Amino acid sequence: MARSRSISGYGIWKYLNPAYYLRRPRRLALLFIVFVSVSMLVWDRINLAREHEVEVFKLNEEVSRLEQMLEELNGGVGNKPLKTLKDAPEDPVDKQRRQKVKEAMIHAWSSYEKYAWGKDELQPRTKDGTDSFGGLGATMVDSLDTLYIMGLDEQFQKAREWVASSLDFDKDYDASMFETTIRVVGGLLSAYDLSGDKMFLEKAKDIADRLLPAWNTPTGIPYNIINLRNGNAHNPSWAAGGDSILADSGTEQLEFIALSQRTGDPKYQQKVEKVITELNKNFPADGLLPIYINPDNANPSYSTTTFGAMGDSFYEYLLKVWVQGNKTSAVKPYRDMWEKSMKGLLSLVKKSTPSSFTYICEKNGNNLIDKMDELACFAPGMLALGASGYGPDEEKKFLSLAGELAWTCYNFYQSTPTKLAGENYFFTAGQDMSVGTSWNILRPETVESLFYLWRLTGNKTYQEWGWNIFQAFEKNSRVESGYVGLKDVNTGAKDNKMQSFFLAETLKYLYLLFSPSSVISLDEWVFNTEAHPLKIVARNDPRKPTIALRQRKFGHQINV
């Protein structure tokens, strides 16, 4: 019995001894076959798990597509098209104004091309460039879709060649998640959706992959700064207690969802969806969140609540992800969160005296602060865009509020000697508004809202206001070598920077303000917060976006 156990033990161990196989070639071959088979089995299981994840993503896409079809058959209210202005015979004045805006873009681009080619931004007064975003070609990438929409083919192709041959993201640079996503990922995806050029999609995937480690936190709420080379992520040193910033953490959804749709890889969408899922767990009844969020436990910090800096685009993206998903049931949670936030916005609305300017306060704790950033002037456009999802009475109420806020924002411009708005305004009883921070850096938010309101109401007053703002830029900001901001809107003293968003947003929205509504139709495109249009595709719909071809004359979009 003992011997039997001994022999049995020897019989097991001899097969584990390499010498046993080395003396017998056939057995060595057998060992090799077993090794290869086991390796293939393990590798196959890894691949199978990955394929299963992708397959589940595609199945969810198909389910959502079928749900969308059912909603359309049932005539779902939430999926009704926007009441956008129908194209009519072109007003000659609109054509002339559109051409003037196009000429402004040519002047801005030619100056960048001459003095700062490949740099992030142009410094017009010193006629050189600066890499304010680590050398990511911010102006180049930000301008791609504007050039395309305006029909500036030669300039677009030259920029395309630079992106293909010279844009390199392998940099030891601590990048802002927010800025890199909205400018670079958004700009590249928009260029892809417009042109169909897959090079842009590959570049977008490259930079997005470098940003992904920022979401590796206990809650999935991302750190807001990441090194593009080594993936080390952290929050800005000046942020309260090392917290993440609300807008910086909730303004990647449009771009990363679009990237998953275009590539078929769910990982991008999964990262950004988890953020909203986490925030929705304890989303307040008024839908208002402070500007600082702890990435370890998702708790908001006691801090300012605002529709201005560091809060703004979080609320914008709740609405626009719903629009991007074609307003189907798959994206209804975003709409629900946004409607809660609009109840909160109403609680912040006040009127000045004596002129009854409607404005949006900031809030600190339970205290309202009578201050409104020019950045918050995106809100009229957001309200107009979202109004159609309500019933008739609520739609009318929110459109009316949008118009009142737009009038206030327009008067931010009209109330200064240069007719350009300051950075923020304070409201004092009996004195209406007074400029606080007095610089103007060529921001787009007011003309953005005028664009939406004109498209959705057909009221040409908004075009007139936009034209007046454009003329003020031409008078005060245009210089021989580009456009500059103002250090002070009261004195007209100039700075030395042409912000990339002036080409990406301000000039694009002004151009579209005087273009037919078929040019980047709001029923077919959704703009990210940097004004990069992304094709609307039903959430999880496996169908690729229809690429639009351009009429050469005006840059009109025609679906084929």
Curated annotation (Swiss-Prot):
Residues 48-560 are lumenal. Optimum temperature is 25 degrees Celsius. Its EC number is 3.2.1.113, 3.2.1.209. The keyword Calcium applies. Residues 1-27 are cytoplasmic. It is found in: Golgi apparatus membrane. Glycans are attached at N326, N459. The chain crosses the membrane at residues 28-47. InterPro entries: 6hp_glycosidase-like_sf, Glyco_hydro_47, Glycosyl_Hydrolase_47, Seven-hairpin_glycosidases. Optimum pH is 6.0. Stable from pH 4.5 to 6.5. Pathway: Protein modification; protein glycosylation. Signal peptide: none annotated. Disulfide bonds join C377-C409. Inhibited by kifunensine and 1-deoxymannojirimycin, but not by swainsonine. Its main location: Golgi. One of its GO terms (cellular component) is endosome. One of its GO terms (molecular function) is alpha-mannosidase activity. Keywords: Calcium, Coiled coil, Disulfide bond, Glycoprotein, Golgi apparatus, Hydrolase, Magnesium, Manganese, Membrane, Metal-binding, Signal-anchor, Transmembrane, Transmembrane helix. It comes from the Eukaryota. The active site is at E179, D312, E423, E445. Belongs to the glycosyl hydrolase 47 family. This is Mannosyl-oligosaccharide 1,2-alpha-mannosidase MNS1. It comes from Arabidopsis thaliana. The gene is MNS1.
